[in-house]
Design a protein with these regions (language model features):
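Juxtamembrane helix-capping/reentrant segments at transmembrane boundaries
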Residues: 79-100
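N-terminal topogenic module of multi-pass integral membrane proteins
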Residues: 2-72
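Helix-coil boundary and interhelical linker segments in multi-pass alpha-helical membrane proteins
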Residues: 42-56, 109-124, 177-188
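Hydrophobic alpha-helical transmembrane segments in multi-pass integral membrane proteins
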Residues: 102-110, 164-181
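Membrane-helix boundary/juxtamembrane motif in polytopic membrane proteins
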Residues: 143-168, 217-218
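Small-residue-rich transmembrane alpha-helices that serve as helix-helix interface/gating elements
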Residues: 186-204
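Generic alpha-helical transmembrane segments
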Residues: 61-69, 101-105, 123-142, 166, ...
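Alpha-helical transmembrane segments in multipass membrane proteins, preferentially the mid-helix core
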Residues: 133-150, 170-177, 205-209
Length: 218
C-alpha cells in the first residue's frame, strides 16, 4: 500500500491568520533592520566616545527608522505588532515614527542654527563617519528602488521611510566632512542643513501619518 502523500508546503493559515510569503523585499528589509540597529549602536558608541550629542542623536534616528522597518516586516509577514494587522494601521504608525524622530532632530538642529558649537571630530573619525553615512544613504536608496517595483501600500510606506532616513543622513555627512576641512565653526550651516532636511523628513512622516491607503484585496 502506498504511503500517504504529505504536504510539505508552508500552511497558508497559522493561528487563524493568513501566512504571507516572504518576498525578496521583505528579506532585504529584515537585513536592513539588522544593519540599521548595528549602525545605530556603532553611532552611539562613537558618539559617547567623542562626547558628540549630534552623533548620538543620529544613532537615535537610525534606531527609529529600524523600528519603522521592523513594523513593515512584521505586518508584511502576517504578524500583528502592537495590534497592527494591515497596511491601514501600519502605514500611519510608520509615519508617526518618522514624524516624531524628525521633529526631535529639528529641535536639536535649531540649537546649532542659533549658535551652539558644532561637534568637531578627529580627521580619521570624521572620515569613518562620512563613509558609513554615505553607505547608509546608498543602502536606503537601494531599498527605495527595490520597493518601487510594486505599488502595495506597505511598500510605499517603506519607500518613504527610506527616503526620510536618507535625508537625515546628509547633514551628518556634511558635518563630519566640514569638521576637518574647515577650521572655523560652521554651526549655522550645519543647523540650517539639519532644519531643511529634517523638515522634509517631517513632511514625509506627517503625510504618512494622515494618509489612509486603500486596503489591498486579499
Amino acid at each position: 500500500m502506498a504511503a500517504p502523500l504529505t504536504n510539505n508546503r508552508t500552511p497558508r493559515w497559522v493561528n487563524g491568520q493568513r501566512r504571507k510569503p516572504v518576498t525578496r523585499t521583505t528579506l532585504l528589509t529584515r537585513l536592513s533592520v539588522l544593519w540599521g540597529m548595528g549602525l545605530a549602536a556603532g553611532k552611539l558608541v562613537m558618539g559617547l566616545s567623542v562626547a558628540s550629542v549630534f552623533l548620538c542623536l543620529h544613532a537615535f534616528y537610525t534606531a527609529c527608522m529600524g523600528l519603522a522597518r521592523w513594523l513593515f516586516v512584521r505586518v508584511q509577514t502576517g504578524g500583528r505588532p502592537f495590534g497592527l494587522w494591515s497596511a491601514r494601521g501600519c502605514y500611519p504608525a510608520m509615519g508617526g515614527i518618522v514624524l516624531s524622530a524628525s521633529v526631535f532632530y529639528m529641535l536639536y538642529s535649531l540649537r546649532l542654527f542659533l549658535g551652539q558649537p558644532s561637534p568637531r571630530y578627529h580627521r580619521y573619525v570624521a572620515i569613518a563617519i562620512a563613509v558609513f553615512t554615505l553607505a547608509e544613504i546608498v543602502l536606503n536608496i537601494y531599498g527605495s528602488v527595490t520597493a518601487r517595483r510594486r505599488s502595495e501600500p506597505l511598500l510605499h510606506a517603506l519607500r518613504l521611510t527610506n527616503l526620510a532616513a536618507s535625508l537625515i543622513c546628509l547633514p551628518l555627512a556634511q558635518a563630519a566632512i566640514l569638521s576637518f576641512t574647515h577650521t572655523v565653526d560652521l554651526s549655522f550651516y550645519n543647523g540650517l542643513s539639519g532644519l531643511i532636511f529634517g523638515a522634509f523628513a517631517a513632511i514625509i512622516g506627517a503625510w504618512m501619518l494622515f494618509h489612509r491607503p486603500k486596503q489591498p484585496a486579499e
